[in-house]
UniProtKB/Swiss-Prot annotation:
Keywords: Antibiotic biosynthesis, Methyltransferase, S-adenosyl-L-methionine, Transferase. Belongs to the class I-like SAM-binding methyltransferase superfamily. Cation-independent O-methyltransferase family. This is Carminomycin 4-O-methyltransferase DauK. GO terms for molecular function: methyltransferase activity; O-methyltransferase activity; protein dimerization activity. Homodimer and homotetramer in equilibrium. Involved in the biosynthesis of the anthracyclines carminomycin and daunorubicin (daunomycin) which are aromatic polyketide antibiotics that exhibit high cytotoxicity and are widely applied in the chemotherapy of a variety of cancers. In vivo, catalyzes the transfer of a methyl group from S-adenosyl-L-methionine to the 4-O-position of carminomycin to form daunorubicin. In vitro, it also methylates the anthracyclines rhodomycin D (10-carbomethoxy-13-deoxycarminomycin), 10-carboxy-13-deoxycarminomycin, 13-deoxy-carminomycin and 13-dihydrocarminomycin at the 4-hydroxyl position. InterPro entries: COMT-like, O_MeTrfase_dom, Plant_O-MeTrfase_dimerisation, SAM-dependent_MTases_sf, WH-like_DNA-bd_sf, WH_DNA-bd_sf. Substrate binds at residues 163, 257, 303.
Length: 356
């Protein structure tokens, strides 16, 4: 028989219960995503400050919208600064479409990432099987779905660009490009990393390898940056032999998308394409200690599982993947990330016959 809790213990139990309810809430994340999808903050900033005006702008029912707005006030994203009139708080202003943090797009349920977050509703399935659940929700694997939906592909590329552009100067500055003539950026998106290298090292040329849906975007970006004469873009598949050899091969935010066996296949293709003395540079989220319980690390790690079957990796994992591809982790450089809320690292891999 369980002892009756003491009166003194009950407040602690109530606090614990409130914490659990808050952590287990599904409605609050969906309220935030709905506000982003409806562009509520943009409409408010444009002058639609009442429920009636917002309902007209968003094609929603006023009585239902009021319920949503009440919860947005309760969680601190909106405030009622005059009777019946609402304004965004400092946190709520992050959901403005033109805010540099781009959080509205990240939370918009019509765009690639927030839409993919619905895969978390089948997390038990992913934990039991170790496989992604995106396909069971949407009928196709993540990248195949993007390939058939140009709108999703464009939103995904845009989201990655706004999240990662701020991080490219640091890895470009962290590596010595003196003896590098050509860089191959594998899965390089619109070419932001290759562009950062080209600006820093004028003697270096580069190739960006990407899927068909991103090639035109990358070419346009590099043309606008005035770098198309030094950085070219080719369509290709990094599971096949790479289109050319290089002194440095970049994998920026690529391997976290893939399970270990596929990550080894990608690394093996990269190793095959290295010029003598060349190096593979892996640019990813930094947490190289085993048994990491960091909240941001574990959240992204689970996201990679349910979206793609991929994973974030500790230093021990990187050593194992490198060895399986005939490589060795030669160096790990921690990178400053003043504008994004997590740390990044640059891992330098060398052929096992020459690495440290």
């Amino acid at each position: 028989m369980t002892a009756e809790p003491t009166v003194a213990a009950r407040p602690q139990q109530i606090d614990a219960l409130r914490t659990l309810i808050r952590l287990g809430s599904l409605h609050t994340p969906m309220v935030v995503r709905t506000a982003a999808t409806l562009r509520l903050v943009d409409h408010i900033l444009a002058g639609a400050r009442t429920v009636k005006a917002l309902a007209a702008r968003t094609d929603t029912r006023p009585e239902a919208l009021l319920r949503l707005i009440r919860h947005l006030v309760a969680i601190g994203l909106l405030e009622e600064d005059a009777p019946g009139e609402f304004a965004p708080t400092e946190v709520g202003k992050l959901l403005a479409d033109d805010h540099p943090a781009a959080q509205r797009a990240w939370h918009d349920l019509t765009q690639a990432v927030a839409r993919a977050d619905i895969s978390f509703t089948r997390l038990p399935e992913a934990i039991r099987s170790g496989r992604p659940t995106y396909e069971s929700v949407y009928g196709k694997p993540f990248y195949e779905d993007l390939a058939g939906r140009p709108d999703l592909r464009a939103s995904f590329d845009s989201l990655l660009a706004c999240d990662q552009d701020v991080a490219f100067d640091a890895p470009a500055a962290a590596h010595d490009w003196t003896n590098v003539r050509h860089v191959l950026d594998v899965g390089g998106g619109k070419g932001g990393f290759a562009a950062a290298i080209a600006r820093r090292a004028p003697h270096v040329s580069a190739t960006v390898l990407e899927m068909a849906g991103t090639v035109d975007t990358a070419r346009s970006y590099l043309r606008d940056a005035g770098l198309s004469d030094r950085v070219d873009v080719v369509e290709g598949d990094f599971f096949e032999p790479l289109p050319r050899r290089a002194d440095a091969i970049i994998l920026s935010f690529v391997l976290l998308n893939w399970p270990d066996h596929d990550a080894v296949r990608i690394l093996t293709r990269c190793a095959e394409a290295l010029e003598p003395g060349g190096r593979i540079l892996i640019h990813e989220r930094d947490d190289l200690h085993e048994n990491s319980f960091n909240e941001q690390f574990t959240e992204l790690d689970l996201r990679m599982l349910v979206f793609l079957g991929g994973a974030l990796r500790t230093r021990e994992k990187w050593d194992g993947l490198a060895a399986s591809a005939g490589l060795v982790v030669e160096e790990v450089r921690q990178l400053p990330s003043p504008t994004i809320p997590y740390d990044l690292s640059l891992l330098v891999l060398a052929p096992a016959s020459t690495g440290a």
